[in-house]
Amino acid sequence: MSEKYDAIVIGMGPSGIFFAYELIQLKKAKNILLIDQGKRVENRNCPIEKVGKCVKCQPYCNITSGFSGAGAFSDGKLSLYNDEDDDIYVGGILQEYIGVENTKRLIDYTDDIYLKFGADKKLEGVNFKDEVKVIKEKSKKQGINLINIPIRHLGT
């Protein structure tokens, strides 16, 4: 195979997919080879419904291996942040490295990409603010810190 690539990305989970996307957006690569173990999405199926148990597909599980892993067949949640709160409760300790505003910008940027590719515009966790406030106060009395942030539902 004499094909030449500007970049080769191994592993097509969210990090690999976003890395390839960014290479293209930044015009750093046009011809990218994406490699992941497992079959193509359209060739992946799980026999568990037919046989009633996991048959341990070989060499790789048809559900967890391949482009997007199990995410190709399930839903996900993109945790955002609360505009009314100075703290960000997602992204680990990223804000300690790049600051709160830059972290918020990255979260917004990621959310915009998902929306661009068809994510549901509706946000979960933004309704019932008064009820959440009451539950949060009750939780605090029990030593529990209830964190309420918007969630974007992705997939099925």
Annotate each predicted stretch with a short phrase.
Residues 4-5, 28-30, 67-68:
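Short coil/turn connectors at secondary-structure junctions
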Residues 20, 24-25:
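Gly/Ala-rich phosphate-binding loop of Rossmann-like dinucleotide-binding domains
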Residues 40-156:
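Conserved N-terminal/central alpha/beta ligand/cofactor-binding core
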Residues 2-15, 33-35:
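Beta1/beta-strand and adjacent pyrophosphate-binding region of the FAD-binding site
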Residues 29-36, 41:
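Short beta-strand "acidic-cap" motif of Rossmann-like dinucleotide-binding folds
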